[in-house]
Structures are given as structure tokens and as C-alpha cells.
């Protein structure tokens, strides 16, 4: 087998915005690529390092000795020293990596955003050219079904992300993420069963992501800097994969691209983690690409590149035509030995601009979005108070030159606007409806759940995130407190957030946490306040309906639940609550219909057979009632309630002995 191995987390500038020409004809071959018709395309293995800073990599100059495996791989690869991510969040950045398009084109601008079927997608393209395709994910955040990252499984024969479905308890490694070595083990198991022929594997490692909880011995070894422990552990996982590729004879023939999707602020500029700001701590990412047989191995490229360049690079390397819709540029021209040696500072690549953005602050907090352009020696950030930094003299971006160098800022601002205009597709995506369980899992990962309410307003309007970043940090800390079962502290902190920055999302989160404490009387007004601010939040309607059910306000719960199922017909849990609410309010025909709906999704639902049996009995359908109550008994033989309700039906039928028998059975089961 042959393959390409990629570790993601970097971005490339847009050539068309700079008015440049392509570095290499899109369908030309690299020197490493065989051109005979009998040649076998190399295998492709994509490994993305989530939340991994460039300055932690030994091959990029770090002295922390965290990445021996990656450093060894880098010696046989082309290393890009200035690679930049387009978005400091996992789904948008991975969408850029895999589509070769900018966020304003693929429209995956946050969590929950679907990847459109008409956007070019590397797995689907390669599958069409005979590649077998598989993905192995380290976090629920890339689960390919609503409401996480819908559409990301397009083109994959295998998309291994369902580990969280089997999770129990509160352990995050059973519910929202899994260790890197486990991800690698699944990938290797797939390789063991894989038949001959080209393949594409994507391996996603999440171990550097907060709350920075690496396994031993990394937990103890890096106790003072646990983020570094996650980096060291993910490097260990990469090493296991590389070792097995070599043992199986796959390493030499493979293309291996290693990158992070984004970095981590670690307190820089006041941001604890990532998602909001666009400084180097979260946007400058590691990127290396090993060509088959280590062609050009050891070469270092200092030209500015972007993650959007990865997809066309991979396609060109394996001889697959690059779709015209792809906006990145193939990097093979920079990697080819003769071209780089002949003109190492070619104007074509010397200063391509790099674009990045984050709409996360707008979508989730109601603040302004941020956009940036790295061009020549400058970092320009488009914000309510724009920013300009001289990267050569101020690499930490501490001295804003936007006022003193207004002409430069004006020029870069115009270039940024032009780039956005040239790379948008004119469409507007909407987030998938977020169910409460999914909302809690995103919270455990430190992310807000976007209701979509702020999509109605201009993303470039609102407070400057620089003035509000502590709010984002407080929310993140509250999420971690909630996950670690410190309920009262997390609720108190969230109430402080609401006092300073009231949004529908925060009120919904507060209502959810209060419900978890069974404090329904406080949860109800919080959820009603959320709906005042965002009447279209279906998840909040569901939470309010559920809360009202728990307080036995069935009449109040019904309209809330009805709003959800009208928009999301397959919201099975809402149908389950509705069947009970209708039954308790004597709307029996509607209760029967809801039971039948639920059973259409799950023919083993005990509660639906129970309510259906009782409701049919109350409408005079004794035969149907007994039939469904018996099905309930078959599912749960030790449950007393179906026997008690069967007794009522037998009474209606005048079968007193049968009624007495069922009541006796119900009484016996109640005492067991």
C-alpha cells in the first residue's frame, strides 16, 4: 500500500488577491511523482494536530524537547516555517484544509455549521480516483452528523468518530474525546484489514486541547506546564504511527503532511485558549510535508503559506486534477529542489499574503468578528479598533501602529476587503439545531453552542473582542467547573458573566445547569429570558418544555415541544415528552400519534408502548390497548405499571378475574 500522511494546522496566502501567478501549473508533476501509466498512486495519511502551537516544535526551533518523533520526520520532509491557519477553531480550519477553500467560501464558520455538498472535498475527490478513504477522529467536535460537523464524512468509506456513543459516566475520555494512541490504534487496525491499492487516511489527534490532561508519565513529567505534556504525548502517538508505517513497508512511498489546525493562546493578549484572537499564538502553525522517498527531505521553506494550500498540494502530488473552485495554491513549486535552488526568494512566493478570520466572537457572544491579513512585514487585524503590527520588530504584537501608520493600515484593510470579496461564494449557511446533550458536550470541550441568533446581524458590528475577552475566559472556566462537578461555583461564575454580557446563549446555558441541579423554578425564568432574546432557538424551546414537564406543567410544555418538532421532525426525545404531555392533558388522539412516531424511530421504546396502551384503552380500543401493554411487558417484565394499566382495561371489558390477576401481579412487582 502507498499513502500520503498529513498533520494539519497551517494556512497559505491567496495568490489571486496579491495579483500573482501560480507557482506551478496545477496539473504538472513533482519530480517525485512517477508519470508512467503503470505507477501506483501513493497512499495518503492525513494526521492533524489539534490546538498545537508552532513554537513547541523542535523542528521549528523549540528547545523544550517535546517532539522527537516529529523532529525525526521533519528531517525527511519539507518544513514550512511560516504557515498560517485560516481560522482558530477545529471544524472551520479542517474544512479549509480538506476543501482548499477559505472559510468565506466553504461557510463552515463555527461549530455546528454543515459542510455543503457542492464544495470540493479531498476525500470525495480521491475516492472518485480509486482511493479507499478512512478517518479516525480524536474528538466529538468532528462528529459528522448534526449538530457537530455535519457533512465531514462525505467521501469516506470509514469515518471512525462514534466512540462517544458508547460512553458512560462523566469521564471526558468516554464522552467527548479519546487519547491519541487509541486513535492511532484504530487507524492501524484499519490498515491491517486494508486490501492492496491506494488509500487516504486522516488521523486527528486532540491531546493538546485543554483542559490539558495528558496520561502518565506525561502528566507527572509536565505537571507545571500540562499543555506541553499534551504535545509530548501526541508526538508519542505520531511516533507509534510512523513506526508502524515503516514496519509495514508503507512509509517510503507515502506522502506525509503534518500540520496543526490552529494553536493556543495560553494567556497571550488576555485569551486563555483559542477561538477569538488572530495573533501568532493561535494562527502560526507547524506544517511539514514528506514526499515519497523523502524527495527534497530536509528543505526549509521560509515563504509564507496557508492551510488552504494543503488540498491542492496533495492532489497535484498524486496526479489528481485540482478543481477550479479550490482557492489555495499547490506548494510543490516551493518543494521542488531545482526551482527552490535556482531562485529561493522568487517574488511569486516571497510575500503572498495570509488571510485569517474568526466569527466565533460574533456568533456566540454578540461581539464583532475579527479578520486579519499578514502581508510583507505586517500583521493587520480588522476590528472595531483596528490593529497593525510590525512583525519584524514586534513579533509578539504588543505595539499597535494603526494610528501612527494609518496609510499602511488603510492599504492592508483594502487588500483584506478585496481578498474577502474575491473568495466568498455569496451563500449564507445556518447552524444545525443543537440538542441539549450536544450542547453539554460542546461545553465540556470549552465551546459555546451557537443558536444562530447573531446570524441576523452584521458580523462586523458589536463590541471589540479586545474589550470583552475576559468574558470568554470566564465562560470557559465556568464550563470546566461544571464538567468537574463544581455546580454552585460554575453557576455563580456564569451569573457574573450574564451580569456583564447578557446573551441568549448564556441564559440557555444557565437554565441547563440549573436543570441539572433540579432547580426548575430558577431554570424556567432563565430559559424564558433566553427565548425573549432569541425566539428561534429550538434547543432552548426544548429545554423549557422539558423543564415544564418536570414541574408537571404539561399544558405549558406542549407549545414549547411542538415548536421544536415542527422544525426538527426527527427530535425523538421531544416526541417522547409530547406523548406524555398529551396523555396527561387528555389529548389522547395526539398522544397516540406521538407514540406511533417514536416507535417508528425505535420499536423497542418501553415508554411509548406503555402510553400508547393506556391512551388506546381510554379511547375504547381495548384490543389495541392490551396488545401494546403486552409489548411493554415483553420489554420490561419486572415493570408493575403495564400490569396495573392492563387491569384497568380488563375492568372496562368486564373481565374482573383478569383484572384481579394483573393487579396482583402489579402489586407483587412493586414490592420486589
What role is predicted for each listed range?
Residues 3, 9-546, 550-553, 559, ...:
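Catalytic domains that recognize anionic headgroups
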Residues 604-653:
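Ankyrin-repeat and related helical/solenoid repeat scaffolds used for protein-protein interactions
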Residues 572-607, 613-614:
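Eukaryotic tandem repeat interaction scaffolds
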Residues 496-499, 529-532, 563-566, 596-600, ...:
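Conserved structural position within tetratricopeptide repeats
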Amino acid at each position: 500500500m502507498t499513502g500520503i500522511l498529513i498533520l494539519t494546522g497551517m494556512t497559505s496566502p491567496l495568490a489571486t488577491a496579491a495579483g500573482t501567478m501560480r507557482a506551478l501549473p496545477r496539473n504538472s508533476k513533482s519530480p517525485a511523482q512517477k508519470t508512467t501509466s503503470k505507477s501506483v498512486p501513493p497512499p495518503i495519511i492525513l494526521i492533524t494536530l489539534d490546538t498545537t502551537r508552532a513554537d513547541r516544535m523542535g523542528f521549528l526551533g523549540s528547545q523544550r524537547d517535546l517532539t522527537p518523533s516529529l523532529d525525526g520526520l521533519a528531517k525527511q520532509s519539507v518544513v514550512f516555517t511560516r504557515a498560517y491557519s485560516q481560522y482558530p477553531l477545529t471544524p472551520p480550519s479542517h474544512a479549509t484544509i480538506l476543501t482548499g477553500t477559505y472559510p468565506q467560501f466553504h461557510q463552515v464558520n463555527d461549530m455546528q455549521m454543515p459542510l455543503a455538498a457542492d464544495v470540493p472535498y479531498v476525500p470525495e475527490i480521491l475516492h472518485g480516483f480509486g482511493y479507499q478513504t478512512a478517518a479516525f477522529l480524536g474528538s466529538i467536535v468532528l462528529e459528522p452528523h448534526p449538530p457537530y460537523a455535519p457533512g465531514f464524512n462525505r467521501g469516506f468509506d470509514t469515518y471512525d468518530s462514534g466512540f462517544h456513543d458508547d460512553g458512560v459516566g462523566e469521564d471526558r475520555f468516554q464522552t467527548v474525546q479519546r487519547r491519541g494512541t487509541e486513535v492511532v490504534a484504530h487507524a492501524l487496525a484499519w490498515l491491517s484489514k486494508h486490501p492492496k491499492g491506494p488509500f487516504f487516511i486522516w488521523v486527528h489527534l486532540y491531546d493538546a486541547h485543554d483542559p490539558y490532561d495528558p496520561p502518565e508519565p506525561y502528566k507527572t513529567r509536565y505537571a507545571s506546564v500540562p499543555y506541553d505534556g499534551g504535545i509530548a504525548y501526541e508526538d508519542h502517538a505520531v511516533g507509534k504511527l510512523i513506526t508502524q508505517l515503516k514496519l509495514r513497508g508503507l512509509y517510503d512511498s507515502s506522502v506525509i503532511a503534518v500540520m496543526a489546525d490552529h494553536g493556543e493562546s495560553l494567556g497571550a493578549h488576555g485569551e486563555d485558549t483559542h477561538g477569538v484572537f488572530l495573533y501568532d499564538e493561535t494562527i502560526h502553525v507547524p506544517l511539514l510535508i514528506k514526499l515519497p522517498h523523502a524527495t527534497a527531505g530536509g528543505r526549509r521553506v521560509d515563504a509564507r503559506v496557508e492551510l488552504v494550500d494543503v488540498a491542492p498540494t496533495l492532489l497535484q502530488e498524486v496526479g489528481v486534477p485540482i478543481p477550479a473552485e479550490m482557492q489555495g495554491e499547490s506548494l510543490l513549486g516551493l518543494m521542488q529542489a531545482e526551482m527552490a535552488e535556482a531562485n529561493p526568494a522568487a517574488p511569486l512566493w516571497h510575500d503572498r499574503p495570509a488571510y485569517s478570520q474568526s466569527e466565533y466572537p460574533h456568533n456566540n457572544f454578540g461581539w464583532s468578528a475579527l479578520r486579519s491579513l499578514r502581508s510583507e512585514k505586517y500583521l493587520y487585524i480588522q476590528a472595531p479598533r483596528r490593529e497593525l503590527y510590525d512583525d519584524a520588530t514586534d513579533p509578539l504584537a504588543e505595539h499597535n501602529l494603526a494610528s501612527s501608520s494609518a496609510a499602511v493600515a488603510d492599504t492592508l484593510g483594502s487588500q483584506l476587503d478585496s481578498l474577502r470579496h474575491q473568495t466568498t461564494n455569496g451563500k449564507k449557511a445556518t447552524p444545525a439545531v443543537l440538542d441539549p446533550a450536544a450542547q453539554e458536550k460542546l461545553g465540556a470541550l470549552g465551546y459555546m453552542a451557537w443558536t444562530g441568533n447573531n446570524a441576523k446581524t452584521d458580523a462586523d458590528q458589536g463590541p471589540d473582542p479586545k474589550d470583552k475577552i475576559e468574558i470568554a475566559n470566564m465562560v470557559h472556566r465556568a464550563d470546566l467547573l461544571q464538567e468537574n462537578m463544581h455546580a454552585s461555583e460554575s453557576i455563580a461564575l456564569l451569573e457574573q458573566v450574564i451580569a456583564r454580557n447578557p446573551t441568549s446563549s448564556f441564559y440557555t446555558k444557565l437554565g441547563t445547569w440549573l436543570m441539572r441541579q433540579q432547580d426548575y423554578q430558577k431554570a424556567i425564568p432563565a430559559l424564558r429570558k433566553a427565548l425573549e432574546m432569541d425566539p428561534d432557538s429550538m434547543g432552548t424551546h426544548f429545554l423549557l418544555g422539558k423543564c415544564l414537564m418536570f414541574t408537571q406543567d404539561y399544558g405549558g410544555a406542549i407549545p414549547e415541544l411542538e415548536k421544536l418538532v415542527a422544525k426538527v421532525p426527527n427530535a425523538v426525545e421531544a416526541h417522547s415528552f409530547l406523548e406524555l404531555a398529551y396523555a396527561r392533558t387528555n389529548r389522547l388522539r395526539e398522544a397516540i400519534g406521538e407514540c406511533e412516531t417514536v416507535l417508528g424511530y425505535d420499536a423497542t421504546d418501553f415508554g411509548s408502548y406503555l402510553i400508547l396502551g393506556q391512551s388506546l384503552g381510554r379511547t375504547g380500543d381495548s384490543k389495541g390497548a392490551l396488545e401494546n401493554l403486552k409489548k411493554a411487558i415483553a420489554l420490561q417484565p419486572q415493570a408493575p405499571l403495564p400490569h396495573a394499566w392492563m387491569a384497568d382495561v380488563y375492568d372496562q371489558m368486564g373481565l374482573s378475574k383478569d383484572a384481579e390477576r394483573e393487579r396482583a401481579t402489579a402489586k407483587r412487582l412493586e414490592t420486589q
